[in-house]
């Protein structure tokens, strides 16, 4: 990070502390305590005492190709010494005897160890202002194992006829007892009466018989009329005499 930006932030913090002191938000003792902890001026090449005693290492999770001068290319599994955390998204570190900037979301914390005495490496850092790089998206690797083939059902050879399985004969159900009225009386079927064809009378015989009866009746009628008339007439004659 640029030294000018850090020194500007320190100046802003002191101004804010003075404003809080004048507003009676903090006391003079607190102001002096906080102000004494702040450095007067920050140099970009100096490191904090904690960083001088320990070295922080991170491990690369993804491959990263340098996009411009000053970037540090990474390979998955590389161990990188963190020299400076420029921002939450970008770190400056050393790996494979190279120093550069790499995205913070491409690494994970690995370990820390005590720093060995060695000469300070001069590496000027410029102001970095660029967007964060999202981790690469990997497609799922193809399975190394061959897919299991579904075996086809067994087909008998040609000309071979498999006998059907024997059918199980079901035992007959027991007949219910007679008192349950389960057995119904068979309905009697009546045959319709046969129609007899009417007997046709012989026209000649009937006509002859009817004519005979008519002639016989007319004779009887004439005889009766004649007999009655003669009897009445005799009575009248007798009454006159």
From Swiss-Prot:
Function: Involved in resistance to EDTA.
Record's protein name: LAS seventeen-binding protein 1
Keywords: Acetylation, Cytoplasm, Cytoskeleton, Isopeptide bond, Nucleus, Phosphoprotein, SH3 domain, Ubl conjugation
Gene behind the chain: LSB1
Protein family (similarity comment): Belongs to the LSB1 family.
Post-translational modifications reported in the UniProt record: Ubiquitinated by RSP5.
Statement: the UniProt record of this protein carries the keyword Acetylation: yes
Biased composition regions of type Low complexity, renumbered to the chain: 118-131, 180-213
Transmembrane segments: none
Location relative to the cell: Cytoplasm; Nucleus; Cytoplasm, Cytoskeleton, Actin patch
Gene3D superfamilies (UniProt xref): SH3 Domains
Modified residues (Phosphoserine): 48, 114, 116
Residues annotated as signal peptide: none
Record motif PY motif, residues: 135-138
Entry note about domains: The PY motif is recognized directly by the WW domains of RSP5.
PANTHER family, per database record: JAK PATHWAY SIGNAL TRANSDUCTION ADAPTOR MOLECULE, LAS SEVENTEEN-BINDING PROTEIN 1
Subunit and partners: Interacts with LAS17, RSP5 and SUP35.
Residue ranges constituting the SH3 domain according to the UniProt record: 53-112
PROSITE patterns linked: SH3
N-acetylserine carried by residues: 2
Highest taxon listed in the record's lineage: Eukaryota
GO cellular component: actin cortical patch; cytoplasm; nucleus
Listed Pro residues bias regions: 163-179
Ranges where the record places region Disordered: 118-213
GO annotation terms (biological process): negative regulation of Arp2/3 complex-mediated actin nucleation
Cross-link Glycyl lysine isopeptide (Lys-Gly) (interchain with G-Cter in ubiquitin): residue positions: 41, 79, 118, 219
């Amino acid at each position: 990070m640029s030294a000018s930006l850090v020194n500007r932030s320190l100046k802003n913090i002191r101004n804010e502390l003075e404003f809080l002191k004048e507003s009676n938000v903090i006391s003079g003792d607190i102001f002096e305590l906080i102000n004494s902890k702040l450095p007067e001026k920050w140099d970009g090449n100096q490191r904090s005492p904690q960083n001088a005693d320990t070295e922080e290492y991170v491990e690369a999770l993804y491959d990263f190709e340098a996009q411009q001068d000053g970037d540090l290319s990474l390979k998955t599994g590389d161990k990188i010494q963190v020299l400076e955390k420029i921002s939450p998204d970008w770190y400056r570190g050393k790996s494979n005897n190279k120093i550069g900037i790499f995205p913070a979301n491409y690494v994970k914390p690995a370990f820390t160890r005590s720093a060995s005495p060695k000469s300070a490496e001069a590496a000027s850092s410029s102001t970095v202002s660029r967007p964060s790089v999202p981790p690469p998206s990997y497609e799922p690797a193809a399975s190394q194992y061959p897919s299991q083939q579904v075996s086809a059902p067994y087909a008998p050879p040609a000309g071979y006829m498999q006998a059907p399985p024997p059918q199980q004969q079901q035992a007959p159900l027991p007949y219910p007892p007679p008192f349950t009225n389960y057995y119904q009386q068979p309905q009697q079927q009546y045959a319709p009466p046969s129609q007899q064809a009417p007997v046709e009378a012989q026209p000649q015989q009937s006509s002859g018989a009817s004519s005979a009866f008519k002639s016989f009746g007319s004779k009887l009628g004439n005889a009766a009329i004649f007999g009655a008339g003669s009897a009445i007439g005799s009575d009248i004659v007798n009454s006159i005499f």
